[in-house]
Amino acid sequence: MKDYEVVIGLEVHVELATKTKIFCGCSTEFGGAPNSHTCPVCTGMPGSLPVLNKKVVEYAAAVGLATNCTITQDCKFDRKNYFYADNPQNYQISQLYLPICRNGHVDVTLSDGTEKTIRIHEIHMEEDAGKLVHDEWEGVSYVDYNRSGVPLIEIVSEPDMRSAEEVIAYLTKLRTTIQYLGASDCKLQEGSMRADVNLSVRERGSSEFGTRTETKNLNSFAAIERAIKAETARQIDLIEAGEKVVQETRRWNDDKEYSYAMRSKEDAQDYRYFPDPDLVPIHISDEYLAELKAKQPEFKDEKKARYIEEFGLPEYDAEILTDSKKFTEIFEEATAICNQPKKVSNWIMGETMRLMKEESAKTGREFRAEELTFSPESLAKIITLVEKKEINNAAAKEIFEHVFAENVDVDSLGI
C-alpha cells in the first residue's frame, strides 16, 4: 500500500457569552422553556429590524487579537440566503466578504515536544439558527427559536493539520484561549463549541489536495479523534480499491463509530450572498482597538511560565493548572491567603481532580473545572489547619469532600 498523509482543516463555531442575542435584546440563557426567549427580530417577523450587540464585536475582535489575526477595522454583514424550518428569516446574517478577523495563527506543542503553527484563514460573526425537535412517536417536528439569533463566531483554519493529535492540540489551544478571555465557556456537549472537520488524504510528498469531506455532529474531543481516524481509513480504502472519494458532508455517529453521507457538496446550493441592507458597516477605530489590546489577559503560556518562575512550581503542575482558567483562579486566590503554592497545587491536582472524576462517573458526563463552586478561601483554610497540625490529612480530605460537594465554609463545620 502507498504511504498516505491526511490533510485537515477545521471550521469551529463558538457561541459567545453575551447576555443577549446578536441583533435583539432577547436572553441567551441556556435551557429556558421552548420559544420563551424570542421576539419579532429573532423570529423573522416582517418589518422587524436588527440592532447589533456591541459586545459581540468586542468578543470577536478580542479572539482575533488573541489568535494573532489582522482586525478588519471596516467590516460588514452579509445575508446567506436559504430556506429551512429552523431559519425563520429564510436567510442567516453572517460575514462573507469582509470578516472581522483574517490571517491569524496559533502555535501548538505536540506530545513529542515539537511545535507547530496552524494558520487561521478568518474569523467571522454570525447568528445561530433555531433548534428542531423531532417526535418520532407522534410523527411531528417542533421548532424552538430560543437559540435563533444567539451570537456565534466561526473560526476557519487553513488545511495545516496532519493528524488527529494536531487537531486536538489546536482545539485545546483555541478553547483555553477563548475561556481565558471569558468570551465563551466552550462546552462541546452543550454545543457552545462545535467543530466541523474538513479532511482529505493524498500520497505523502504530494503538493496536490485530495477530494475532501466535511464531518459534522462531533460533540467531544474523543469523538473528533475517532471520526478523523475512521474517515482517514475510509478514504484510503476507497483510493486503494480504485474508487472515487465523493465531496460530501457526512454525519458522525459516535455510538456506532461510523459516518454516513448527509448531502453532496457538488450539489450545494448557491447561497446568493449580498450585503445586509438593514445593518450599517462596522468601523473599529484605532482607539477602540488599542483599548481591546490593553484588556487582553495573561494567557496560558505566559501564566505557565510565571507559575514556574514566581511560585517555583514544576512544569507538570504549571501545565495542569493553566489548562483551566478556573484552576488558575482557585490556585492564585488560595495561594495569596495561605502562601503555600505547591500545597495548593497538590490539592487541586490531587483531591479536586479525584472528586471531579468521581462526579463524572456518577453523572455519565465530563465534570469540568468551570463547574467547581467551592471557595479558594476554604481550600486555603484546610491547608493552614493541616500545616498547624490542628487536623490530619485524613480529616482534611473528609472536610474537603463536604466543601467540594456543598460549598460549605470550613468554619461552619465547627473545627
Per-region residue spans from a language model:
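Basic, nucleic-acid-interacting segments
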Residues: M1-P297, E315, A336-Q340
